[in-house]
């Protein structure tokens, strides 16, 4: 199925060579696992029918925003509130660093005394705990919110409360809140497209492949999976999906799933995982089976980079959470300054493999900071 995609900052491994979530049980057969994933995905899709950041027409890259709107004026003593998913995942810890260092940089440039307060749950299933964190920030009176929801629905009521209090809300990656004022994050559908293209190139466009999916409730999991499948279909690829199953963003579940698939599918050549944590679990299963299987993840966490250097993980689609946070912070400040922002700002991402794993991230994505000025 061909889909119109909002173009973010996208760098593929091929271009570089030329110049960081269903059932948790192992299935009895690949067919059964495919049927299970299909049903859970279909049940979850309705929550984002109203808004899809990957296809939203009112969208720009951060470079396009800067070209159109210019410098960012920063008022004194602003407080931005950021609520993330689990701090046990390196992706979210890196996002936190991006928020905090963005504030430091902006204060150095402007003397504005900007504060970004970051909170996160201890695991990726505590939907109620995450909601409480957002409510606390609303009651505290933050000037804007940057939210990365666990699911597409757990923060809906909190977003409405924030809007009632005239607090603008940025939905930052992962779960999609249809009622949020704005969205900033990587194009999840493109994650899957990049992975499928890279695997196809490595395998000569033929071979059995499998997909380890995150949580069925998560927008990113569904979009990454669909992007992977659509690339295969749209390009009449010889890649053959023989198994797919949710592992709920859990490394051990992904490892167990992969171990079963390797036994059931002796011709399995590649496994695409919706995030790096699951991919690293799959790498363990592949090593233990002494199999020759490509493993591709998503997120670009440090452990994934290390595994690529060591010859374990084959590739990751780096969504650069550090720079996602810096983009989101910039966007929130632009809104507070009264600038007319697009509904969606696409953040940088790139495929990382052995060819570019040691290149500087800022160089890969061509990163520069915005110009910030004091009010």
Segments predicted by a language model, with ranges:
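Generic cytosolic/nucleocytoplasmic N-terminal low-complexity/intrinsically disordered segments
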Residues: 1-3, 33-34
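Sec-dependent N-terminal signal peptides of Gram-positive bacterial secreted proteins and lipoproteins
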Residues: 2-24
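A residue-level marker of the well-folded mature domains of exported/periplasmic proteins
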Residues: 14, 21-375
């Amino acid at each position: 199925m061909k889909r119109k995609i909002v173009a973010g900052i996208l760098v593929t491994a091929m271009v570089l060579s030329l110049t960081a979530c269903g059932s948790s049980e192992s299935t009895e057969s690949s067919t059964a696992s495919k049927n299970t994933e299909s049903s859970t995905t279909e049940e979850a899709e309705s929550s984002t029918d109203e808004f899809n950041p990957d296809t939203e027409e009112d969208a720009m890259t951060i470079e396009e925003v800067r070209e159109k709107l210019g410098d960012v004026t920063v008022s004194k003593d602003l407080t931005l509130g950021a609520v993330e998913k689990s701090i046990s995942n390196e992706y979210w810890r890196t996002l936190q660093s991006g928020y905090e260092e963005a504030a430091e940089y902006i204060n150095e440039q402007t003397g504005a005394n900007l504060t970004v307060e970051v909170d996160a749950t201890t695991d990726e299933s505590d939907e109620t705990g995450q909601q409480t964190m957002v409510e606390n920030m609303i009651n505290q009176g933050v000037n804007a919110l940057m939210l990365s929801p666990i699911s597409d629905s757990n923060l809906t009521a909190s977003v409405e409360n924030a809007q009632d209090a005239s607090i603008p809300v940025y939905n930052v990656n992962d779960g999609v809140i249809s009622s949020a004022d704005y969205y900033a994050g990587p194009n999840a559908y493109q994650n899957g497209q990049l992975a499928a293209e890279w695997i196809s190139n490595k395998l000569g466009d033929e071979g059995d492949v499998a997909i380890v999916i995150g949580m069925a409730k998560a927008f990113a999991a569904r979009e990454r999976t669909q992007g992977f499948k659509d690339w295969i279909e749209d390009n009449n690829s010889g890649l053959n999906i023989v198994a797919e199953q949710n592992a709920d963003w859990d490394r051990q579940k992904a490892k167990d799933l992969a171990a079963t698939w390797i036994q059931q599918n002796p011709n399995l050549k590649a496994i695409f995982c919706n995030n790096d944590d699951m991919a690293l679990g799959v790498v363990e299963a592949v090593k233990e089976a002494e199999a020759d299987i490509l493993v591709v993840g998503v997120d670009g966490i440090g452990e994934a980079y290390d595994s690529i250097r060591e010859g374990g993980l084959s590739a990751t689609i780096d969504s650069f959470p550090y720079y996602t946070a810096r983009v989101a912070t910039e966007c929130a400040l632009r809104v507070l300054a009264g600038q007319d922002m697009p509904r969606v700002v696409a953040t940088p991402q790139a495929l990382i493999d052995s060819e570019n794993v040691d290149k500087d991230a800022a160089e890969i994505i061509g990163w520069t900071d915005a110009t910030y000025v004091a009010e």
